Amino acid sequence: MSLVFVISPPRAGSTLLQRMMGAHSEVFTHPEPHLISPIAHLGVYGNVDKAPYDHINAAEAIKAFIDDLPNKQQDYLDALRAYTDTMYGRMLSTSSSSLFLDKTPANALVLPFLQRLYPDAKYVVLTRHPLAVFSSYANSFFNGDWQAAHEFNPILERYVPAMARFIRERPVPL
């Protein structure tokens, strides 16, 4: 199974790109599966702001557990990859395609984790002027109320630095 991740903020044209690429017989895609960002926030690679359990205790316990694994971080990444490979693979098995495309915008917020989990995947980075992204977001979901849109999701502060760092550092071929 081959994976392609479209890295993009919301409202940057990723759905159109997904539909265009998904029209190819070898590419299968599913609307924003959100498989990566939740496992990136188990407390090992990123902090959890809110959870219905003691996320601080859970993060520390998971880190201690990982430290006792024979191959430590590598065993943990292998287990997480087994989960996502299974999920992507099962979805891919419903088609005759050989490539799965994931365009979940939240993946842009966990890029160091994603590239560690899938260093051999293909990454397509889609950019759009940040103010055009935010304007589209505010107009599409908040009737043009930029303040309400920003309070709900500060897209500019979240996506621009994360994507800029990824493009600048190029940890994987783009």
Give the residues covered by each predicted segment:
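P-loop (Walker A) phosphate-binding loop of NTP-binding proteins
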Residues: 9
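PAPS-dependent sulfation machinery
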Residues: 28-110, 117
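ATP-binding Walker
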Residues: 12
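PAPS-dependent sulfotransferase catalytic domain
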Residues: 91-174
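Hydrophobic anchor at the beta1->P-loop junction of P-loop NTPases
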Residues: 6
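Pre-Walker A (Motif I) flank of P-loop NTPase domains
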Residues: 1-3
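A conserved segment at the C-terminal end of the G1
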Residues: 15-27
